[in-house]
Amino acid sequence: MSMIDDLPPLRDVIKRHALSARKSLGQNFLLDLNLTSRIARAAGPLQDATVVEIGPGPGGLTRALLAVGAKHVIAIERDERALGALEEISDRYPGRLTIINADATDFDPRPLLGTTRAKIVANLPYNIATALLIRWLSIEPWPPWYDVMVLMFQREVAERIVARENEDAYGRLGVLSNWRAETKILFDISPAAFVPQPQVTSSVVRLIPRYNPEPCDRRSLEQVAAAAFGHRRKMLRQSLKSLPADPASLAAAAGIDPTRRAETVSISGFAAMARELASIVGSGKRL
């Protein structure tokens, strides 16, 4: 028996359903139910919550979410081999688990949610984690259909997500993440907690959507950040040359010294440059 329910231990579940982790699916199974419970609790009170989980695998986090009281869990799993294990959890928690056999990168849960706001809680497959996060942060209109995300990433990716100006990991991902959400690394998880063991430490990150982010067009923000960090060691007057505006004039119009480098510019600074760029593109003129 596990420590959170009367279902079999995860190692037994994996063996019985022949769930050897597949590298092609970015799978690393987290077997420590104390850790899965900690992740579940990090999403806040779940008693009235609908939770969307990506890549549940044998269901360790799924079980934790249900055991701590989630009203409903929507589990999106691409690997058909895991469906039997998830069905066993569904039988233990009747009416509270919906299992979707789909690829999370092109599945939209909103039709299942209706007007219900959800929480996203997941040990994301490493090979799609960043792409999924960018997708969820790029939702329009904003604010999104979720009110919190608690997600696991490789430590290096987690540091990029939460990084701010003048930090080594600051880049395009940090600009988008911190523009649209309050971000925080909650805790790390050792490779030894997984089967198979990854070669890197993992980190659990919480992202809470900002209902009123700095006003600017998202695409313009991404365009400016991509240009600026594409040549991060160069001054803005050089790195922004790929944009449809004179780079020095664009930065100056946004109140930023064009001799600065991207890594020193705050989220507000990038938003200001994005507003200037959108204005230029909209007017059909070039500064």
Curated annotation (Swiss-Prot):
Pfam families: RrnaAD
SMART domains reported for this sequence: rADc
Binding site for S-adenosyl-L-methionine: N28, L30, G55, E77, D103, N123
General function of this protein: Specifically dimethylates two adjacent adenosines (A1518 and A1519) in the loop of a conserved hairpin near the 3'-end of 16S rRNA in the 30S particle. May play a critical role in biogenesis of 30S subunits.
Catalysed conversion reaction: adenosine(1518)/adenosine(1519) in 16S rRNA + 4 S-adenosyl-L-methionine = N(6)-dimethyladenosine(1518)/N(6)-dimethyladenosine(1519) in 16S rRNA + 4 S-adenosyl-L-homocysteine + 4 H(+)
Domain of life: Bacteria
Keyword entries, A-Z: Cytoplasm, Methyltransferase, RNA-binding, rRNA processing, S-adenosyl-L-methionine, Transferase
Gene name of the encoded protein: rsmA
Entries under PROSITE patterns matching the protein: RRNA_A_DIMETH (PS01131), SAM_RNA_A_N6_MT (PS51689)
Protein family per UniProt: Belongs to the class I-like SAM-binding methyltransferase superfamily. rRNA adenine N(6)-methyltransferase family. RsmA subfamily.
GO cellular component labels: cytosol
SUPFAM superfamilies the UniProt entry points to: S-adenosyl-L-methionine-dependent methyltransferases (SSF53335)
Protein name per UniProt: Ribosomal RNA small subunit methyltransferase A
Cellular localisation: Cytoplasm
One GO MF term attached to the UniProt entry: RNA binding
UniProt organism field: Nitrobacter winogradskyi (strain ATCC 25391 / DSM 10237 / CIP 104748 / NCIMB 11846 / Nb-255)
E.C. number: 2.1.1.182
